[in-house]
Design a protein with these regions (language model features):
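Active-site metal-binding motif and surrounding structural segment of the metallo-beta-lactamase
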Residues: 42-92, 180-183
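Glycine/Thr-rich phosphate-binding loops of Rossmann-like dinucleotide-binding domains
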Residues: 14, 45, 72, 103, ...
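Short amphipathic alpha-helix with an adjacent loop that forms part of the alpha/beta core around
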Residues: 48-54, 128-132, 173-178
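Metallo-beta-lactamase
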Residues: 88-148, 155-156, 249-252
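Conserved beta-strand hairpin/beta-sheet module of binuclear metal-dependent hydrolase folds
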Residues: 2-51, 148-165, 183
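Cap/insert and terminal regions of metallo-dependent hydrolase folds
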Residues: 168-254
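Active-site neighborhood of phospho(di)ester-bond hydrolases with catalytic His/Asp-centered motifs
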Residues: 36-40, 59-70, 161-166, 184-188, ...
Length: 258
């Protein structure tokens, strides 16, 4: 059994600052293995507020796609919770080098890093990383101001692929299509790119879904303009346009992959 639980589906400064949507990231559960992806601000509180609670002490890995605040704000407290205050070192930490290296303004505190016995530097090691029943691989570096990598989680005979924050470029389609994802999670921050920033838009999401052809697509990490236009309605429109089952994630939603 593989499932995704979205603790938070908000992105961008205003949505995060006002917590219009939570910025807590999402969990992957796969045959007894638990991973927390991009634990932004509020991740610990949101995890424990779920019914039933998502217990950080059951986590096998914490994974960062990149070090920006809305993706990594709660990484240290989640490490402490996973390792029970450091008294029970366990699990794995997966993050780009600039999120960890003390010479590169890291977001993971050195003392918290010592609690975790296994570490995978995303983007530096091209070999797959095994965490329980899950195999994690990374895509080549995406186009964002800090080190950012797409991630692929293989478990139960299915692949969950994640496109975090990036500017659109054609290489994304080729790389992700080769992974044949059962589910594609896309961070769709903006409706239109009126500010020329390194984030995906609604139109980019359509191009990605049409090109990659996943089994299903899930939009998340919404900014204010996406929320104003009703992500659920936009997901229906994308499904009609692409022929691919498309969902707009919401806080607390669980999706069963297999």
């Amino acid at each position: 059994m593989v499932s995704l639980q979205f603790l938070g589906t908000g992105g961008a400064r205003w949505v995060v600052a006002k917590q219009i949507r939570s910025s807590a990231g999402f969990w992957i559960r796969a045959d007894g293995t638990n991973l927390h992806i991009d634990p932004g601000p509020g991740a610990l509180v949101r995890a424990l507020a779920q019914l039933p609670p998502c217990d950080p002490a059951t986590l096998d890995a914490i994974v960062l796609s990149h070090k920006h605040l809305d993706h990594a704000g709660d990484v240290n407290v989640m490490i402490e919770a996973m390792c029970q205050g450091g008294w029970r070192p366990r699990g794995a930490l997966c993050a780009p080098r600039d999120a960890l290296d003390e010479s590169m303004q890291p977001v993971v505190f050195p003392y918290a890093r010592r609690f975790v016995p296994r570490e995978w530097i995303v983007g530096a090691d091209e070999s797959p990383f095994e965490v329980g029943s899950v195999t994690i691989t990374a895509s080549p570096r995406l186009r964002h101001p800090v080190e950012t990598y797409g991630l692929h989680f293989r478990a139960g005979g299915a692949t969950v692929s994640y496109i975090p924050c990036t500017r659109y470029f054609d290489g994304i389609v080729d790389d992700y299509r080769a992974r044949a994802p059962a589910v594609l999670v896309i961070n769709v921050l903006r409706y239109r790119d009126s500010m020329d920033v390194d984030h995906l838009t609604y139109d980019d999401a359509r191009r990605l879904i049409e090109g990659i052809r996943p089994g299903a697509a899930i939009m998340s990490h919404f900014g204010t303009r996406m929320l104003e236009r009703d992500p659920k309605r936009l997901a229906y429109e994308l499904e009609d346009a692409t022929g691919i089952k498309t969902f707009a994630a919401y806080d607390g939603w669980t999706y069963d992959v297999v």
